[in-house]
Amino acid sequence: MDMSEVSEYIKDNIKRKVVVVGASTGTDAHTVGIDAIMNMKGFAGHYGLERYEMIEAHNLGSQVPNEEFIKKAIEFKADVLLVSQTVTQKNIHIQNLTELVELLEAEGLRDKVILICGGPRITHELAKELGYDAGFGPGKYADDVATFAITEMVKRRKK
């Protein structure tokens, strides 16, 4: 779906704005990926989620501790959490992504949010293995992320 189709789908099926909170968490200082998906201007001709009429987007930036990320998710009543991770030496990104899932489970929040990770070497398979609902790598845009998130929200409601 493109930006306008996403907004129409949300209006028809969810009937309120979808709240998305995104960040590069842990020690990751890179924001190119999360900014490409979240920011108003977007990337490569694709607008970011901040421009979507029916999405309330909160980009927390980089180096956000997982605990703070969860705190903000609760504060904003997030429907969707987006985590951007650059692949690191010693697989710190894997530890960080795993820790976030564990913290969400401990808080009883894991099943209440759509959890998505992305980055230059993140695959959908790796994301699923780590306990995420989806993973997006290079060549993906806000349209792709939004389409997955909102269709997953609707699927979960029907269960």
Please annotate each region the language model reported:
Residues 31-38, 43, 47-132, 139-147:
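Cofactor-cradling patches in redox/metallo enzymes
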Residues 26-29:
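Short, surface-exposed ligand-recognition loops at beta-strand->loop->(often short) alpha-helix junctions
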Residues 1-16:
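Short N-terminal or domain-adjacent regulatory/targeting segments
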Residues 19-21:
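Conserved beta-strand elements of the Class I
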Residues 143-159:
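A charged, well-structured terminal subsegment
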